[in-house]
Amino acid sequence: MSSNAHCTVTSLDLSCNFIEDRGINPLSNTMAKLSKGMHHLNLSYCSLTGKGVGNLMQSLTTNRSCATTLTYLNLCGNSMREDSCCHNLCTFLAQPNVVSILDISSTDTPLDMLFGALLRGCTTALTHLNLSRNPFSYQTKKIKEGKDNIPSAFKQFFASTLALQYINVSYCKLPAEALKNLLLGLACNEALKNVELNLSNNQLGAHGGAAVLESCIGGVKCVSRLDLSENAIGR
């Protein structure tokens, strides 16, 4: 690909290969130059570090075509905890884009850092959002103790997104206040319908989430499929 200036590949699936950073860095350089952009990119479980993913996202941002062509982005199972990686991911997502399916599950991406970008660039096309097995924040303890607020963009995104059909925030240890903001945002959204919401394995029964569900879920009209399994509700 790197040696072909006229490469026509627009869909690339390298999932479950040991690409590592030494493989993704030259690929990133190529991504920055693809004249037709990229439509489908699956790099799940490729043993990438935050530095490698950060370089990739910087290249996708540099290539202006990708903002108007990339509809599928799967980075699941790679390590993306580094601040620079999160920054570059957010920079790409914050620009107007056409990403329809976004999977960054199991990447250690702090969700509270992500939603400002989603609100700015992903409210029109995004239909499938998989954020499972990520921490809501690396300051979750402060949020629980009331020392910090949930970012306003978190609720605003769910209130204003226009096409979302699937939301997976399972295994995220969502604080009760985050759950409340998510549900209230969806309750305000009159554009969505038939949404699937996965809240499984969030320990909602142990951290006040059950009370939030009881008080808020009745106002959420857009959700038709709700997964609350493995939450210790009622114990």
Where are the predicted features?
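Leucine-rich tandem repeat or coiled-coil scaffolds
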Residues: 1-235
